Amino acid sequence: MRVKLGHVGHFGLAVHNPEASAAWWQANFDLDEIFRFDDGIGLSNDNVTIVLTKGRAHPATIGHMSFHVADMKTLRRALTALRKNGVDLEDPGDEIGPEAPGSPHLGLWFHDLDGYRWELSVQDGGRQA
């Protein structure tokens, strides 16, 4: 028997400074603080919970994580907001592109305060472009 995975419940990241990291996430994304503990903070919205724990960040251990957005209009708005907020975006001037060569999905990539790599993507975005 193989176990079918459901939606991601939450994921945890080791970060240098949970307070600074939580502030960064909340300044850039629709996330609310839902709990605190001695060494960390949990942020959440209707789709995801991110637990930021004080520790040594290891961004190279995760290639990247991707969040889907509704459509290309939303992705373009996100790009504008991230630029305005000074977020470390990949491929300056040509930020939106295929998730992988030949993929119909379009996205953009950025890095958080600890160097973790993230993606915002639109499924079948190439058809909407």
Task: State each model region's role.
Residues M1-A20, T49, I62-M65, D124-A129:
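N-terminal beta-strand motif that seeds the catalytic metal site of vicinal oxygen chelate
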Residues M1-K4, V8-H16, S44, A57-A129, ...:
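Vicinal oxygen chelate
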Residues A20, D38-I41, A100, Q128:
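Short glycine/proline-centered loop/turn elements that form peptide/ligand docking sites
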Residues D30-R36, D88-G93:
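Short secondary-structure junctions
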